[in-house]
Amino acid sequence: MVKLWAIVVMVAIALLRSTFAKQLSCTMELDRSCSLIGAKVSSDEILTTTFASSNPSTLSTVQFARSSLTGIPPAMFQTFPKLESLNATGSDIKQIQSRNFADAKTLQSLYLRGNKIHDLPDVAFFGASRLQTLDLSDNAIATIESTAFKRLRELKTLLLGSNSLTELQPGVFDDLSDLERLELQQNGLGSIDDRLFQGCHSLTALNVSHNALKTFNVAQFERRWSFDLIDASYNKLSVVRIPPNLRQLVAIGNGIRTVESTATNGSELILLKLPHNKLTSVDEVPVFDKLITLDLSFNRIREFDFRSAARFGKLVLLKLDGNQLESVSNSLTAPITHLKYVHLADNQFTHLDLNVLRTVPRILKLDLRRNQLERLAVTDLAGSFPVMVRIMLEGNRFRCPDSRPLLKELKESITAYAMTRNDCRKEENLIDGICCS
Ligand SMILES: *[C@@H]1O[C@H](CO)[C@@H](O)[C@H](O)[C@H]1NC(C)=O
Ligand SMILES: *[C@@H]1O[C@H](CO)[C@@H](O)[C@H](O)[C@H]1NC(C)=O
Ligand SMILES: *[C@@H]1O[C@H](CO)[C@@H](O)[C@H](O)[C@H]1NC(C)=O
């Protein structure tokens, strides 16, 4: 008898469950999208939850807001067979099961940023073969099975930043032949295998910053076409080897002492940003003939001659702020006209003669802030630097009597320089726009 009752109760519960299986409804807007606000799906409801909307067969976009879903109910993709974009950002999602997206045949964008996903199982996105954008940033992903991204041959953007990855399985990106942009920043990656990206024939932008990489073979991205940007900042690299097809390399805050080029016949590099590393000379950077921006600020450079800048025939912006320069020299015999912006702030100049820049006549902006300049000499500013529109002098220690000749030159030129009272230290006076004492 007791047994029978138990069975009756269980059957009743089962019936109730299916009769009252959770249904999430939304109203389709004119743009074929709908929002599900405040939806709640617990782990035992994932497989039974159903969806409803007016005209579900044409719905293209679903957006969750203020929702708490343990997982994405697969019924969504059966009810909305034309779904192209699903945004479940910040929705408390904890799990993705293998083939969760088996029916997501038209899905192109999947936004799962800011959830609580710990792992991506085998064939996690199997079925969603039209996917182009997959945002998994800011989760707690520590494990990605090697087939998790299987068959995502149209995927262009994969965002895995701010997770807990310490390693990546060989082959995990092998099917991503259309992938253009990959974000892996802010994980705990200790190494990246040289063959990890061998299947990613279209990759042109990669962010591996804020990991724990001791080595990273940038040269593996040598291809016949150009690779746009690699950001390897805030790792523990001491060497970078730059392939000829790379256009921009950013590697701030490593321990880089050596920069190499693997180019034998010209390089595509236009931007090289290496602040906060351990380089001791501009000449340690090999020649890149198309380089436009070279940022070596906050390294350990003690000497600089403008001849080093002339090695880069297209260089426009040179940043050497925050080094240990006490002076600069110039052994150039012919002028260079490409260099237009020179940053020398936060060095240790006490005296500087601007005539040292006479072979850089097209300079537009010169930054000398926060040195210890007491005197800045120049003869014929307007004539030597006819296009210099700005000189930045804040945070120095100019002597008032010594700055009169400089002021005269400045007033006769187009160069803006003026400081304000706020730029001066307490004991300083502001005289004709220059703080001095
Ligand atoms: C996804 O939703 C979040 C808020 O829930 C919003 O901030 C974000 O812009 C949306 N993303 C897209 C691509 O619509
Ligand atoms: C790479 O990611 C870091 C951290 O999120 C970010 O600050 C940086 O701007 C990104 N790099 C590029 C080139 O977008
Ligand atoms: C080097 O580059 C020039 C022009 O960019 C090209 O004509 C030449 O064939 C290249 N040589 C080699 C060995 O690739």
Question: Which sequence ranges carry the predicted segments?
Answer:
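Cleavable N-terminal signal peptides of Sec/SRP-targeted secreted and luminal proteins
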Residues: 3-21
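LRR N-terminal entry segment and analogous cap-like coil->beta motifs
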Residues: 31-92
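Leucine-rich repeat
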Residues: 42, 55-57, 70, 78-82, 94, 102-107, 118, 126-131, ...
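Conserved hydrophobic beta-strand positions in leucine-rich repeat
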Residues: 60-64, 86-88, 107-112, 131-136, ...
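Consensus "Asn ladder" position of solenoid repeat domains
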Residues: 67, 91, 115, 136-139, ...
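Solenoidal tandem-repeat scaffolds enriched in leucines and small polar residues
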Residues: 126-128, 132-264, 268-278
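Leucine-rich repeat domain C-terminal region
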Residues: 225-227, 340-341, 346, 350, ...
